[in-house]
Curated annotation (Swiss-Prot):
UniProt subcellular location: Cytoplasm, Cytosol
Reactions that this protein is recorded to catalyse: thyroxine + 3'-phosphoadenylyl sulfate = thyroxine sulfate + adenosine 3',5'-bisphosphate + H(+)
Main location as per UniProt: cytoplasm
Binding residue positions for 3'-phosphoadenylyl sulfate: 65-70, 140, 148, 203, 237-242, 259-261
SUPFAM superfamilies: P-loop containing nucleoside triphosphate hydrolases
Gene: SULT6B1
Stated name of the protein: Sulfotransferase 6B1
Native organism: Pan troglodytes (Chimpanzee)
Family named by the database record: Belongs to the sulfotransferase 1 family.
Taxon lineage: Eukaryota, Metazoa, Chordata, Craniata, Vertebrata
Active site: H118 (proton acceptor)
EC category name: transferase
UniProt key word Cytoplasm: yes
One GO cellular component term: cytoplasm
Keywords assigned by UniProt, alphabetized: Cytoplasm, Transferase
GO biological process: sulfation
Length: 303
């Protein structure tokens, strides 16, 4: 991640704000969804409507803890492979995070720009669709996502912690966590995953065959790489490789962003009733949908 100082500077500022923030005061609500006051403001959301996307922007959309930092790294490496230029991060890459002037500054950034986001499809600026930017949508099974989100809150020293996993799970299922409900996010994106400029990525598929996943991402973005280049990026993008470099790339929060990356870690925390509750929620929200099938829920969340 090229301009480490800017990336880390933003994270450090957010962590500093978090020190003084009680969990009960961590969120503000904008258009019905809770966001962390340490990273987002209503003024920034209002300014977001004026953001002008470009046709060669690369949008990475995901619910928190679904692998966006992983994909960010992979796309940065792909850009480097085809251009021989390290991708620079003059701003924190999550589109909705930062001050309201950032979109004005971003007009001067060279193409292609990587724009990460945790927003619902219908909360994104219209210019992304009008100008046909490429959108990678990353999903991870909801049980592992929940456990990863809990550990992020409770392991990072300066972020307000939950009293217990049970407390976090209750709030998660009510959508009272940063960026709201996983299932609301999923329902909102479900109808838009088969568009010409949209590519669905499953975290678990990447874990199973990283090189194949990188090749698919490269082809979707119109990057033509050799097998050797794909293999090189794959080696540099394993979870272990990224965790080893995480302090350099993401600062103090790095080791917590890349904690385990395992598939099935949910089995260490979910109780039987919680399992049933999430299985019912999945059935209610996503059974019979295109996204429901893509998530391979039975393989990764049952048994």
């Amino acid at each position: 991640m090229a301009d480490k100082s800017k990336f880390i500077e933003y994270i450090d500022e957010a962590l500093e704000k978090s020190k003084e923030t009680a969990l009960s005061h961590l969120f503000f609500t904008y258009q019905g969804i809770p966001y962390p006051i340490t990273m987002c403001t209503s003024e920034t959301f209002q300014a977001l409507d004026t953001f002008e996307a470009r046709h060669d922007d690369i949008v990475l959309a995901s619910y928190p803890k679904c692998g966006s930092n992983w994909i960010l790294h992979i796309v940065s490496e792909l850009i480097y492979a085809v251009s021989k230029k390290k991708y620079e991060y003059p701003e924190f890459p999550v589109l909705e995070c930062g001050d309201s002037e950032k979109y004005q500054r971003m007009k001067g950034f060279p193409s292609p720009r990587i724009l990460a986001t945790h927003l619902h499809y219908d909360k994104l600026p219209g210019s992304i669709f009008k100008n046909k930017a490429k959108i990678l949508v990353i999903f991870r099974n909801p049980k592992d996502t929940a456990v990863s989100f809990f550990h992020f809150h409770n392991d990072v020293p300066d972020i307000p912690s939950y009293g217990s996993w049970d407390e976090f799970f209750r709030q998660l299922m009510k959508g009272q966590v940063s960026w709201g409900s996983y299932f609301d996010f999923a329902i909102n994106w479900n109808k838009h995953l088969d568009g010409d400029n949209v590519k669905f990525i499953l975290y678990e598929d990447l874990k199973e065959n990283l090189a194949a996943g990188i090749k698919q991402i490269a082809e979707f973005l119109g990057f033509f790489l050799t097998g050797e280049q794909i293999q090189t990026i794959s080696v540099q993008s394993t979870f272990q490789a990224m965790r080893a470099k995480s302090q350099d790339t993401h600062g103090a929060v790095g080791p917590f962003l890349f904690r385990k990356g395992e598939v099935g870690d949910w089995k260490n925390l979910f109780g039987e009733i919680q399992n049933q509750e999430m299985d019912e929620k999945f059935k209610e929200c996503l059974a019979g949908t295109s996204l429901g099938a893509k998530l391979k829920y039975e393989s990764y969340c049952q048994g």
